């Protein structure tokens, strides 16, 4: 018994010798004498590190399961947030090759000017407009059925100032442009009145040749866009042709020359002959 107590004291002394500031450990000590022999492996405790031990030749890790669950939950939340942030917007779904979004007033003007004789449909929409969202799949179908027609999308929320200068105050709103005619029609419609859109495509969609240059936006609209200080757009108004003044009539117009009057002798002769 005395031997066991002394060995226990040695065991505790060994523990004291291996104590450090950031951990504590127990050195392996063997007990014997009573037919019982066990070995205690070194046990270490460190801040924010899992506990490790050796049990029958296998390594056992003691960790905080709550921390692990928290890390997994945080990773799942971050992945979910990333997926939501990169979700495709409704006005970007189903787009065709002849559909694109306008990013500036200059791009809108250039797109209409360079369209030539092609029919151009300008679609004014807003992300928060329920009617615009419901109508979008139909517009994509029309674009697919009419590959020769150019569809331009204008986001009202991103280009409010430009839409105000163009006089757009209702959504969804559409403008049709064609060659030298410029704007051929404009209207607002929903799924209930989609016939307006279908009829406009049928009327202005067939191929035709313009006799003049492509018009695009009207002169007053271009001037309004240039006057808008919030837009990075410049435009030089076309010179107004001066009408030629009408020729003023002469103050002394030429009058016909009167016939010479007959002399008194001739009159007497005629009277005498009559007698």
Swiss-Prot record:
Positions with biased composition (Low complexity): 249-264
Where is this gene product found?
Plastid, Chloroplast
Query: What keywords appear on the UniProt entry?
Result: Chloroplast, Disulfide bond, Electron transport, Plastid, Redox-active center, Transit peptide, Transport
Gene Ontology CC? chloroplast; chloroplast membrane; chloroplast stroma
Is Hydrolase tagged as a keyword?
Answer: no
Q: Which PROSITE patterns match?
A: THIOREDOXIN_2
Task: List the GO molecular function terms.
Answer: oxidoreductase activity, acting on a sulfur group of donors, disulfide as acceptor
Q: Which InterPro entries match?
A: Thioredoxin-like_sf, Thioredoxin_domain
Catalytic residues (positions): 129 (nucleophile), 132 (nucleophile)
Q: Which residues form the Thioredoxin domain?
A: 73-206
Span of the transit peptide along the chain: 1-72
> Gene3D superfamilies under this entry?
Glutaredoxin
Listed disulfide bonds for this chain?
129-132
Q: Where are the transmembrane segments?
A: none
Q: Where is this region: Disordered?
A: 238-275
Pfam hit, one: Thioredoxin
Q: What does this protein do?
A: Thiol-disulfide oxidoreductase that may participate in various redox reactions. Possesses insulin disulfide bonds reducing activity.
What family name appears in the similarity comment?
Belongs to the thioredoxin family.
Q: Which PANTHER family match?
A: THIOREDOXIN, MITOCHONDRIAL, THIOREDOXIN-LIKE 1-1, CHLOROPLASTIC
Name of this protein: Thioredoxin-like 1-1, chloroplastic
Supply the source organism for this entry: Arabidopsis thaliana (Mouse-ear cress)
């Amino acid at each position: 018994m005395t031997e066991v107590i002394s060995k226990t004291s040695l065991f505790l002394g060994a523990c004291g010798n291996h104590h450090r500031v950031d951990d504590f450990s127990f050195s392996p000590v063997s007990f014997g004498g009573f037919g019982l022999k066990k070995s205690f492996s070194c046990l270490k405790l460190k801040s924010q590190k899992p506990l490790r031990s050796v049990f029958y030749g296998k390594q056992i890790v003691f960790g905080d399961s709550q921390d692990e669950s928290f890390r997994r939950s945080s990773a799942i939340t971050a992945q979910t947030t990333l997926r939501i942030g990169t979700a495709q917007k409704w006005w970007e779904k189903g787009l065709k090759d002849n559909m694109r979004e306008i990013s500036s007033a200059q791009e809108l003007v250039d797109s209409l000017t360079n369209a030539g004789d092609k029919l151009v449909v300008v679609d004014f929409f807003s992300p928060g407009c329920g009617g615009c969202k419901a109508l979008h799949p139909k517009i994509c179908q029309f674009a697919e059925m009419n590959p020769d027609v150019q569809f331009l999308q204008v986001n009202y929320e991103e280009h409010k100032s430009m839409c105000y200068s163009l006089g757009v105050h209702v959504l969804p709103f559409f403008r049709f442009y064609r060659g030298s005619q410029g704007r051929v029609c404009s209207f607002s419609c929903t799924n209930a009145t989609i016939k307006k859109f279908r009829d406009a495509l049928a009327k202005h969609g067939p191929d035709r040749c313009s006799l003049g240059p492509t018009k695009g936006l009207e002169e007053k609209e271009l001037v309004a866009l240039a006057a808008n200080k919030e837009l990075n757009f410049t435009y030089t108004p076309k010179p107004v042709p001066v009408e030629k003044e009408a020729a003023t009539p002469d103050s002394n117009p030429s009058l016909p020359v009167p016939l010479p009057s007959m002399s008194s002798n001739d009159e007497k002769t005629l009277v005498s002959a009559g007698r």
